[in-house]
């Protein structure tokens, strides 16, 4: 856990500027990296990736807790599918471009309208929690309810719910879990707050996201022409 004390000696809580960049701290002063449509992955952040299985990677920070959670789920006789962990900028861009083309063909939309529709369900590259290596997508008819109930005990939170769509800017994703550590997850469990609320961050709206990124949202090649790493 990282704590930060301001010049007046008071421990930081909520959004706090440090060396010209905004950092987010819980009400108890623990720093949590916030990534959403208004907060791209910070320049200073670099995931320490380890391989979980196959070509799936996660940050080492959550590896042990994730393995324990998955093992306990399996021990309970519940089958799950590990769908996604860390994503490169390249991969996120490919997903966005695929969805855009799909909407153009399925709904006979022009590129801009199709991109807007794609952005309703796909995060702008650079603003996905999957870039952190701390978010995982876990599937399974019986597994999702199990993870939803027990994730908190392993340091994970259910990140996106229907009730909080107007705050997170993301539709209901019952499969998406974010690692924040047990000190934070257990404190959040019964709070009814999403991460933005808990950290005192402003709500994410499509209007604010468009204002932040502008025409970059409609440039077909702006994000994803780097080589995949």
Question: Language model features by range: what are they?
Answer:
Residues 80-81, 85-92, 127-131:
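Mid-length scaffold segments of soluble, non-membrane domains
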Residues 30-44:
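Conserved oxyanion/phosphate-binding beta-strand-loop segments in alpha/beta enzyme cores
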Residues 48-87:
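Active-site acidic/histidine clusters and adjacent loop/turn architecture
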Residues 28, 68, 109-229:
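Catalytic cores and adjacent binding grooves of peptidoglycan-active enzymes
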Residues 5, 25, 60-63, 217, ...:
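Extracellular modular ligand-binding repeats in secreted and cell-surface proteins
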Residues 92-104:
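Charged, often glycine-rich, active-site loop that binds/positions anionic groups
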Residues 1-31, 64, 149:
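Extracellular adhesion/carbohydrate-binding repeat motifs centered on closely spaced tryptophans
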């Amino acid at each position: 856990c990282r704590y930060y004390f301001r010049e007046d000696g008071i421990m930081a809580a909520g959004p706090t500027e440090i060396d010209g960049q905004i950092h987010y701290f819980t009400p108890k002063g623990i720093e949590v990296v916030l990534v959403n449509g208004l907060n791209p992955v910070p320049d200073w952040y670099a995931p320490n990736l380890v391989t979980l299985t196959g070509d799936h990677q996660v940050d080492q920070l959550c590896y042990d807790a994730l393995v324990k959670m998955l093992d306990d789920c399996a021990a309970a006789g519940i089958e799950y599918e590990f769908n996604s962990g860390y994503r490169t900028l390249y991969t996120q861009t490919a997903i966005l471009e695929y969805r855009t083309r799909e909407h153009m063909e399925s709904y006979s939309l022009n590129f801009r309208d199709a991109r807007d529709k794609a952005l309703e369900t796909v995060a702008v590259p650079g603003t996905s929690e999957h870039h952190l290596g701390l978010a995982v997508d876990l599937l399974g008819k019986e597994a999702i309810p199990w993870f939803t109930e027990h994730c908190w005990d392993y340091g994970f939170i259910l990140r996106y719910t229907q009730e909080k769509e107007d705050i997170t800017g993301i539709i209901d994703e019952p499969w998406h879990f974010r690692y924040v550590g047990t000190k934070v997850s257990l404190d959040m469990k019964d709070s009814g707050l999403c991460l933005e609320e808990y950290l005192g961050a402003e709500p994410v709206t499509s209007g604010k996201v468009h204002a932040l990124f502008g025409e970059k949202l409609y440039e077909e090649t702006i994000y994803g022409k780097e080589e995949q790493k």
